[in-house]
């Protein structure tokens, strides 16, 4: 089951048919045993898989829970009304055509629950009730299957009209203020037990393709206006059927022909009529509806696409952190006790861990930064001027795998004017990135791989005021510092799963941080020097926008979502170290920690020769 996450949405509001119905109708079979519960269109649960065992959850319910939202309850349930329980926000109802779905959004008394010729309960459609759509909610729409199964769609013109009707529901929600919508297309209706029994698989496939193409064209008008997260259910279905073993499904039967609980398609040893029924091995519960295994796969799929922009945004953080680490490494060469009046060449390196960023759907990031470089310093007036080039690499291991490798170039200067010390650093980095986004789909896992390039620059200014006398071996000074970092990642395309692969846009990211602190530095006396620095820092920008993405198989619409932000805007940094001199050679080693609730370590080592 998917892990719950803190939600970026106020609620989830669903419109659709039986695939998303979370219990509008009563469970008539269970009433005979005195059990009052709701019907859902999937298999019942173990141990008996028969009434009065409850039905499993549909994908929309699973998705709401994964997003950290309240339970997704039916909007028009007679059971909840009789028990005096509040209505929910799931308007999806078994048997709904696209016209019924539109009615549940826009019409007075448009949310209707009942059977053939019988209405059990009705209430106003969503927008009739609320007037304006909640802009913070996540809207989920699916539909169209019943238009095919009920004989409404028999030709291309009818398939076109059906798709237009579903899109009109999107039109109404967007006009009323909805900003984020999940919209699913149709799988191949012919590749179901019902399609097999109809003898019209080829026709149903062709008309399903017409429906999906028209829906794509209608939704494309909202590209850039609102976020529409497309679900390519057709591609997902094809992927599952092509590799059923990956998903824990049976590999010895035609999954498109078999089902779990209906005699007309209960043709396997896993069906309800078998001695050891096991719905987890089958894709269909009846002639059209998924088992709980299918529902879980679809929920996982939707969840992965919703959270993908935040996950992919972490690559920008790795690039930013690489330049930040470069500046801290260069800053260690500018410590007053590290300098003399001679030319100096040096090699240096660093290692640091970062767990600084989190957001909704993204927990703490575990990243490592490493660098090794060579540089030179020359005396200029009352200070020093230098340059360095360093090879840098970084890794981010959770919740996505990102590897960074490249070069960072820095120019730096320090000057003294009386008791006032000033220093500046400017850096440029050019990096290659390898990214791997892991997706869980029920029991299956998919890895989406990609590669791209990144670049960025950073600038830092620092001022300090020396408290100790000029002739003292100690340089003790309070300081203030400001650092700015700007990065760019080129867009790329993921590979590894047609249903999941994304087109990722260029990413821009910046970071501003300021520090105040106290530094203490003793130049080498008898060949030994020490230093220490304590700083309080503040990140001046709270978040960066999440990455814009499109589904590669349905590129008509883009979405991003909530940006990446830190748990804490402030931090403490402590650095200490030791330096040794032997003739013209000098070795400096430093270590420190940075953070607030948790402290991440960093280490630096430098060796130089003066002449």
Predicted regions and their residues:
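Conserved active-site regions of diverse hydrolases
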Residues: 2-338, 351-358
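Short beta-strand segments
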Residues: 14, 92, 140-144, 348, ...
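Transmembrane beta-barrel strand/turn architecture of Gram-negative outer membrane proteins
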Residues: 211-215, 220, 403-415, 459, ...
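Outer membrane beta-barrel translocator domains of Type V secretion systems
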Residues: 314-476, 566, 588-610
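Solvent-exposed flexible segments
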Residues: 467, 476, 481-489
């Amino acid at each position: 089951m998917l892990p719950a996450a803190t939600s970026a949405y106020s609620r989830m509001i669903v419109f659709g048919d039986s695939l998303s119905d979370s219990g509008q109708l009563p469970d008539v079979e269970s009433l005979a045993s005195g059990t009052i519960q709701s019907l859902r269109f999937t298999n019942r649960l173990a141990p008996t898989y028969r009434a009065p065992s409850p039905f499993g959850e549909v994908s929309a319910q699973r998705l709401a829970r994964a997003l950290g939202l309240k339970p997704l309850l039916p909007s028009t349930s007679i059971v909840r009304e009789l028990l005096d329980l509040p209505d929910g926000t799931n308007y999806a109802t078994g048997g709904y055509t696209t016209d019924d779905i539109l009615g549940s959004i826009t019409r007075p008394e448009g949310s209707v629950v009942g059977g053939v010729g019988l209405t059990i309960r009705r209430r106003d459609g969503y927008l009739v009730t609320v007037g304006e759509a909640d802009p913070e909610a996540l809207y989920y729409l699916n539909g169209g299957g019943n238009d095919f199964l009920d004989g409404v769609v028999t030709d291309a013109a009818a398939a076109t009209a059906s798709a237009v009707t579903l899109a009109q529901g999107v039109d109404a929600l967007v006009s009323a203020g909805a900003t984020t919508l999940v919209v699913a297309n149709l799988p191949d209706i012919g590749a179901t037990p019902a399609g097999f029994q109809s003898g019209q698989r080829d026709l149903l496939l062709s008309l399903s393709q017409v429906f999906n193409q028209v829906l794509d064209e209608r939704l494309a008008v909202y590209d850039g206006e609102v976020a529409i997260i497309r679900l390519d259910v057709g591609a997902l279905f094809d992927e599952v059927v092509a590799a059923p073993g990956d998903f824990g499904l049976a590999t010895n039967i035609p999954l498109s022909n078999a089902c779990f609980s209906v005699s007309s398609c209960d043709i396997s040893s896993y069906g309800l009529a078998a001695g050891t029924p096991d719905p987890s091995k089958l894709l269909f519960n009846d002639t059209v509806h998924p088992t709980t295994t299918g529902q879980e796969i679809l929920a996982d799929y939707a969840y992965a696409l919703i959270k993908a922009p935040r996950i992919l945004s972490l690559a920008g953080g790795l690039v930013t952190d690489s330049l930040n680490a470069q500046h801290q490494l260069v800053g260690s060469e500018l410590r007053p006790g590290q300098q003399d009046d001679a030319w100096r060449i040096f090699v240096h390196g660093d290692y640091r861990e970062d767990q600084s960023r989190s957001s909704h759907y993204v927990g703490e990031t575990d990243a490592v930064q490493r660098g090794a470089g060579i540089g030179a310093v020359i005396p200029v007036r009352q200070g020093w001027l230098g340059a360095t080039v360093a090879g840098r690499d970084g890794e981010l291991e959770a919740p996505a795998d990102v590897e960074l490798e490249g070069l960072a170039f820095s120019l730096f200067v320090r000057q003294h004017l009386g008791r006032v010390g000033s220093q500046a650093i400017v850096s440029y980095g050019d990096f290659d990135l390898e990214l791997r986004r892991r997706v869980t789909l029920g029991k299956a896992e998919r890895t989406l791989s990609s590669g791209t390039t990144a670049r960025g620059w950073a600038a830092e200014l620092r001022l300090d005021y020396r408290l100790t006398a000029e002739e003292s071996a100690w340089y003790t000074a309070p300081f203030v510092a400001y650092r700015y970092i700007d990065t760019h990642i080129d867009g790329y395309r993921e590979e590894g799963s047609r249903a999941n692969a994304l087109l990722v846009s260029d990413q821009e990211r910046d970071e501003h941080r300021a520090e105040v602190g106290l530094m203490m530095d003793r130049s080498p006396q008898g060949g030994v020097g020490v230093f220490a620095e304590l700083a309080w820092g503040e990140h001046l920008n709270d978040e960066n926008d999440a990455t814009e993405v499109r589904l590669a198989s349905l590129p008509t619409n883009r979405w991003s979502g909530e940006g990446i932000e830190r748990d804490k805007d402030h931090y403490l940094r402590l650095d200490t170290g030791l330096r040794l001199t032997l003739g013209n050679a000098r070795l400096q080693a430093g270590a420190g920690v940075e953070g607030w609730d948790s402290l991440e370590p960093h280490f630096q080592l430098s060796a130089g020769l003066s002449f």
